[in-house]
Each structure stands twice: as C-alpha cells, then as structure tokens.
C-alpha cells in the first residue's frame, strides 16, 4: 500500500459509514471516535496478518485474543468427514475465533464462511475461509458462483464447513439477544452435499458499544467491528454442541428448515443441551 492510499481499516470504516465519513463533521469527530474504537490496535492487527497464510492468520488471531473457550457436548462434532456447523452469532468476529479454537482440538480441516472483506485485509485467508458478500446489493453472479465453487470443493475434500447463518451480530430485542433471520444457505448446502448438520449454541461477552450505538445510528454501530473483536481478549466463550442433524429430518423448505434450526439452537439447545433436535 502506498503512502497516498488510505489504510484498509479506514476504507472499511468509510464503506460502513458513508454519510458520517463524508460529512463536514467527520474531521472533528474522527479523532474521538478512533480513540474510542481502538483504531491503532486495529491497524496493527491488520498489518500483522496481511502477509500471513490463512492458517497462520487464524493462529495469530487466536494467540492475540487468547479466548477462554469452554465446550459442552463436544463429542457430537465428527472428527472426520464432511459436516456443516451452524451457530448463533452473539458477539461478532470473535465468535469465529472461538469456534476455530474449539474445532482445532480435533480437526485441522475446518473452513469458515466469512465476510469477503476479510480477504481485503489478509488475502491468503482464502485458504481457510469461503468468502461471502453479505451485502445483498453488492452480490453478483460471479461472486455467488465463486462462493458455491469453494463450498463444493470443501465438501468434496470432506472438510468441516462452519457458518454463522445470521451473517451478522445478534441484536437485543426486549432485553434478549436474538440472531438476525438466518440465511438458508447452510441447509441448502448440507442437503445438496448430503452432509450432517452440527448445531452449536454460543455465549460470549456482551458487545456493549455495538448495542449502544445501535440505538442511535446504524453507521456508528457498524464501525465497531474491529473494536468488538479486539476488546474480547481473554474473555470467556461457551459453546454447546448438539447432536448432528441429518438434512432429511428438516423441513423440505430451506427457509423453514433454517428457522427450525435457529429456534432449536436459541431456545432448546441453550437450555437443554442433551435434548436432540426434533422438528
């Protein structure tokens, strides 16, 4: 990156807050907001992982955060062969690091569906993630084709495929943390590739600044992504793995099947870990 080009962290912030960063007030509030968001730490992290391989980038993030990850029902995760892990999304990017920390205890072949912007920070993350354009307006046939092609290869290689079907951090509704509506892609892929689905319920530290800003501004909320990753250092995460669900046990309708899984994970698996999925 040349001296004249903006840093990727600035670019991602500008894309998430175009009205704010394009307004006359931005030069005034930027120093304050950047201090609150821990901007220097985000720049340092991005610089550290930019040249790394996909495996090394994930390992770097794991070592940087040093999360305390507790698992329950971990025996329900197949130690080999294709499978699809679906999980709620309570805190943000750190959820993926917590899942990585858990899975790597028994498998070294996991691949994660993740926001395609990750490749703009560290290009070789393409070795360990399947990039997805989560902004519907930015999706193209080529991007979708590339995502599906990468997924097809992962299943052909009998890998463990991990998705957060909500695609974004959960929101607080009436005092309760609830995922956004789930995309149906996890169910569709599992069905197409005859893969068992492993449901996981995750809890972690509250992303307070995200939820505070969410009350006032979507743009302010969305620029907290790096802050809500780096402030999870040393925090506790709990992952409850449910028994694998065969795709044929789900509703034929992919959207309905996704809702069934979401409801099971948020309401039943969270409270009764030993109770298997039942449509």
Predicted regions and their residues:
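Catalytic core of membrane glycerolipid acyltransferases/transacylases, capturing the structured
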Residues: 28, 36-40, 84-140
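Short secondary-structure boundary/hinge segments and terminal tails
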Residues: 79-80, 121, 172, 208
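Membrane-interfacial amphipathic helices and adjacent loop/beta segments
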Residues: 45-74, 109-146
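Short, contiguous strand/loop micro-motifs
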Residues: 44-46, 86, 137-138, 172-174
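Generic beta-strand structural signal
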Residues: 83, 108-111, 128, 151, ...
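Non-catalytic C-terminal accessory region of glycerolipid acyltransferases
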Residues: 8-13, 144-279
